[in-house]
Amino acid sequence: MKRFAATTALALLGAALSLHAQSEGGIEGAKKFTLHGSIQSDVLTAVSQDNKIGTGEYDDKFMTNTYAELNLLNKYFQAGARLEYLDHPLPGFENDFKGWGVPNFYVKGNYKWAELTLGDFYDQFGSGLIFRTYEERSLGIDNSLRGARLALKPLKGVNIKLLGGQQRYYWHHRNLDNCSPWTWGGDLELNVDQWVKKMDENNTRLTLGFSGVSNHKGEAESTISRLGNTGETDPITDKPIMGLYTLNIPKDVAAFDVRANLQKGNYNFLAEYAWKSQDPSSSNGYIYKRGKTLMLSGSYSKRGMSVLLQAKRSEDMAFRSRATADKGTNACYINHLPAFSMQHTYALASLYPYATQMTPGEWAFQGELAYNFKRRTALGGKYGTNVKVNFSHIRGLGYDKSATTETTSTVFDPKAETETVNYPFFKMSNSVYYQDVNVQIDKKVSKLLKLNFMYAYQRYNIKVVKNESGPIINSHILVAEGKYQFSPKITLRGEAQYLHTKQDQKDWWFGLLELSVLPNFMFTISDQFNAHVPMSTSDGQIDPSVTNKVHYITGSVTFTQGSHRLQVGYAKTRAGYNCSGGVCRYVPAYKGLQASYTFNF
């Protein structure tokens, strides 16, 4: 089936390219359609084992994640398909990713105020607290739904979405282990300002949203057997009887979301609340607890200044289409909780990235102030100075010990009101999960030279975020970046970074040089150094008693021509986490030759 689908996709690619050529040649009928597509191929080869950085031994000497996508559209119709080849996936992608085929295809039609999609699609309700499907290839995320989506705009200011389907789970959508989950949902969004003339005249925008999602898990997951406390007591010893017990997993899990977004002039306020019914799964340890999330956000912006304040409280909001999905993977999440921590782009500032703790939950706060000191002032200088301060603080939920119940048989009854732990709404734990305070300064010194500086102080709870033993990591990070333009075609950019900590692997240094030669070439070399990298044994175990001084050197050449981009280089990378939007994937250390090719048309 996969071979047939792949062959069909390639045939469509050839036919589409032919159609594109005909359109360019002037055939009148073909001009009504537009063809868009892309090819992306990332390759790692010539890998070698290095116990100093813990690469382990790779069975595959040639690894690639390759995607080819086509979309054909006109005013009323759109169709597309994506071919994926991951038979030998890149490091960090679990074995379930192995395979190739056409896992994504769709047709879409729209007329006046209605739009219908059949096949695979992505969408989001509100901020995604109860529903978000999206693709993030670097993290191995594709939780699209295969089914139908209907979007309606029947009246002015009214937007309606109705959808349903089966979620992608690696290469499967249904009948995996006799389990075929179905997800249904609807969203209503009202733009009140379009009905009230005075609001529009006063530059006021008010949007109200209401969403609902239901997930039917399938017959195979209606009961799950587990080993533990059966809830019965031995009459002789008066101790709990340990053994196999059966969990009655709810066949249907419902979630609801309400939100309001008010914009008035330079001000913007958002309030959103989500609720989820009892949803025992591997993510929360199979407890019967209702999920809740409250998110508040306020911002103010004007020319030269902006302020952002956010707060979020989430509790047991891991919403997945399959209850037994591995907790350590990103597969089959129906929802997404926005990250309330800054997503750093500098290498050492992102050395300890934070992953949102969906279970048991978290309190998260973020604030940001950006200010532009005007030109020809004491702090602005000749060209002005941009300063940005960001603060994020995330900690655990506090619980009421007096309300904590014993683990008895009632805990495993989905209809029981008893919950294992009670978390009072305003109570916070003493455990800090993550904290980041950073200051960035961007300064244009002259027409040819630009400088950027950053200082960050971070606290990272390795036990909570990575489930590893160890103390909280306190780190100080300094970054200096400069960009100098030698000529209209030649620019040199450099980075110098330093991270100081007394925990984990102690201090890190990083340096980078990047030479851009327009319009085609870019040359990059970087080195990340640490003097306390623990040795890895031949069987993959870490020996902390033996450490090494290691240079993680990376070099590449990038060639760009039109819509083609080819990058070739050598990489020696440390083990770590690749994160985006509070979602992370572990990537093991590796050493080898890399190549990346992209083409868009």
Indicate residue ranges for each PLM-predicted region:
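Sec-dependent N-terminal signal peptides
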Residues: 4-14
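Beta-barrel outer-membrane channel/assembly domains of diderm bacteria
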Residues: 8, 19-123, 129-130, 145-164, ...
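Exposed, low-structure sequence patches enriched in small/polar residues
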Residues: 40, 63, 198-203, 208-212, ...
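Outer-membrane beta-barrel proteins
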Residues: 90, 94-96, 172-178, 276-289
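Structural signature for solvent-exposed beta-strand/loop edge elements and short helix-capping sites
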Residues: 128-137, 143, 170
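Short acidic, glycine/serine/threonine-rich loops at helix termini
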Residues: 129-131, 173-175, 220-224, 320-322
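Flexible, glycine/proline-enriched loop segments at strand-loop-helix junctions
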Residues: 135-137, 171-178, 244-247
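Short, flexible helix-coil linker/hinge segments at the edges of structured domains or between repeats
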Residues: 216, 221-241, 329-346
